[in-house]
Amino acid sequence: MKLIKADNYQTWYIENLDKSIIIDPWLTNKLQPKGSFFIQRNKANDTILTDEEINKVNSIIITAPFEDHLHFDSIKLFSESTAIYTSNMVKKTLIKNKIKNPIEILDESGTVINSIKVKALPTSYPYYHSTFSIFFEDQNGNSIFHEGHRVNFKYLKNNKINADISILTAEESKLFGFIQLGMNY
């Protein structure tokens, strides 16, 4: 597996056997959803991915229904035949917004994408109803754990989930100054 941090925010790219998965793609310079007071972000570069790498993307994973994960302009950059893997909540939003791509639900039992076993795992408070973390394992046993919000350490310990690489949110953020939204390392 080849892993690339595709931007300076939270888009990730995983390539295996000349095909790739893109996670939470935000491939434009601006994220300013209409009517959104809370999310107004800009970045210098849209992505570090090459055109060749973008053309290898045959699967998109959307981990959360929030605008910085579910970015419609970025999804529309890919062919309508590009499969989207996500939650039931996000699937409803995609359909409501007339996204025509095939949409599959990820869960703990897992599915195989590009010869990688992909499992959706539970996150921690306050995100456990709306987001999921992801566990990837390739045909050689190499593994990656991805969590874009808050890790459910109890679940990982109880289920003996270990990974070669962990992708975690490294900055703490709090809503109204006291509800912890991001990790605090």
Cite the ranges covered by each PLM segment.
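Active-site environment of divalent metal-dependent phosphoester hydrolases
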Residues: 8-10, 28-30, 65-70, 91-94, ...
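Short beta-strand scaffold segments in enzyme catalytic cores
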Residues: 10-15, 132-136
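Active-site-proximal beta-strand elements of phosphoester/diester hydrolases
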Residues: 2-6, 21-24, 117-123, 143-149, ...
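Pre-active-site segment of Zn-dependent metallo-hydrolases
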Residues: 19-61, 72-73, 151-162
